[in-house]
Amino acid sequence: MEFAAFADRAEELAAEPADIGTTRLVTDLLGAAGGTDENDDDLATVTRFLLGRVFPAHDTRTLDVGPALCREAIARAAGPNVTADDVEDRLAEEGEIGAVAAGFEFGGQRGLAAFGEGRDRLTVAAVDAELRRLAAAAGDGSESHKRDALFGLFNRCEPAEAKVIARLVLGEMRLGVGEGAVRDAIAEAFLAGNPEGDERDESDTDDDPILRAGDEAVVAVERALQVTNDYGRVAVLARDEGLNGLRAEGLAVGRPVQAMLAQAGTATDAVEAFGEVAVETKFDGARVQVHYVPESAAEGDDAAGGTELGPRIYSRNMDDVTDALPEVVEYVEARVSVPVILDGEVVAVDDDGDPLPFQEVLRRFRRKHDVDRMREEVGLRLHAFDCLHADGEDLLDEPFRARHDRLAEVLSDAAASVEFAGDPAAIEAAEAAALGAGHEGVMLKNPEAAYTPGNRGRDWLKRKPDVETLDAVVVGAEWGEGRRAELFGTFLLGVRAGDDELATIGKVATGLTDEELADLTERLEPHVVSEDGTEIEIRPEVVLEVGYEEIQTSPTYSSGYALRFPRFVGVRDDKSVDDADSLERVVRLAGDEK
């Protein structure tokens, strides 16, 4: 597929206001990208590009291209009379990098036009290959290599293509295409009238894409997405193997999946919903997923691919944090003798084994050097509480009670303990014991519930804390004053308000030490989009936990709400922008306070 064709469809999608219209456009695009077997790579790539990704969500590779590098590449491709400062000035006017890139005539266009010749057309496959080479650049000179590679792409671009590439490399596609729309489009494009992967028959299809594909097809696509975390792979599976292929797809050890999440609730809520309640300690730690294939067991497990895999530890964001957590690796190696995928929490502990604050855990997660020294200062302990795969068997569809029993088997009875209670008083007693031991409280789970990756449902409840906090995204900043003049001093916060959208909810400047301000400034500077005086626009990448006294309605911020007396609690390194709190939760919390 020519990249210009993809760019044109992207422009249509960005202008499409209706959800059903979006699904139809995505369906048509996937059909065009995956119409023949020769287009396998294009189908997978186009599906990922639609969601602003070059790699599957579980893949730890990144492009590692910041706004400044992108501006420099655009300036170079635009010609000798254009500087990075010129690009930044245009960015201040346009407000987003795609429009800026589309506004320049790049070198390749000018040269070919002078000779009256056409140019070698970019293809989707060529762009994907170049971006993958760019991601592979590492070590000395890697920044220069990335700049050269990006310049080469821009130099071959027409305006619409440049807009998409600039947005793609910075993770700012802004097409208004959510994961749900892509899921539904995969079902419609390849499963409507084609449930088993045979020749399609479109003679008796309805106009509604969801009805045409059918709930069964959408469920099968969703399930395959849960176990693969790869929209490109699932699109190809749906086209080539139909429902049977999607249903046959399982977990793979070494390929992390999204964590199942909890909603807030009370003991009474849990008893009324579940009857008997599984009560677990809620640890003040960082969520992890453990993948391990012992050498002795590799060949007998299809999910292991027949190869040994030393323990790999993945964060909630599916980042590989194995090297920072050697004691977790040792813990797993000492106890597990079969291939497993475990869900759990890593907690910081002192010399006596008592829990330390959450921020101590994050000090270890971020550590790439001097790990042994940090290990002496802050110890870690794994509390595994769920088992998704064991010894060749996927357990997602098994009830929690059975999964926990399997967990106890594979961990030699070292699994996190669970109690079963049938009344609120027993739950409150368990919570008091957990709090007395220095933990965060309790989790309340439906003993009969399956494990649904990425789902925040009512089968897992976390007891409401006495003081609420919000996980909000940094979308802007202001320079400090006085001795803090060279540091960001105030941070503009946003919450999720829809697909690819964030709504501002307030600014936080209280509760930060000089050291924390310096750390945040260092983290955020590579993501600066533009500056206007003391105000700075920042690409959303960093999530902060903030406390507050109350939530008020306010016309000042785009959410319609403002945090009263916000205070910094900590950086949530374990959370991505997609894990930040939603405007829906803000509205609910504001209502609860009235």
UniProtKB/Swiss-Prot annotation:
Q: What is this protein called?
A: DNA ligase
Q: Which residues of this protein are catalytic?
A: 282
Q: What is its EC number?
A: 6.5.1.1
State its cofactor. Answer: Mg(2+)
> What's a single GO BP term from this record?
DNA recombination
Q: What species is this protein from?
A: Halorubrum lacusprofundi (strain ATCC 49239 / DSM 5036 / JCM 8891 / ACAM 34)
The family assignment reads: Belongs to the ATP-dependent DNA ligase family.
**What GO molecular function annotations does the UniProt record carry, in alphabetical order?**
ATP binding; DNA binding; DNA ligase (ATP) activity; metal ion binding
Q: Which gene encodes it?
A: lig
Q: What chemistry does it catalyse, as a reaction equation? A: ATP + (deoxyribonucleotide)n-3'-hydroxyl + 5'-phospho-(deoxyribonucleotide)m = (deoxyribonucleotide)n+m + AMP + diphosphate
Top-level class of the enzyme under EC nomenclature: ligase
Q: Which HAMAP family match?
A: DNA_ligase
Cite the entry's keywords alphabetically: ATP-binding, Cell cycle, Cell division, DNA damage, DNA recombination, DNA repair, DNA replication, Ligase, Magnesium, Metal-binding, Nucleotide-binding
Residues binding ATP: 280, 287, 316, 345, 385, 456, 462
Q: Does the keyword Cell membrane apply?
A: no
Role description: DNA ligase that seals nicks in double-stranded DNA during DNA replication, DNA recombination and DNA repair.
An example Pfam family from this entry, by short name, is DNA_ligase_A_M
* Residue pairs linked by disulfide bridges in the UniProt entry: none
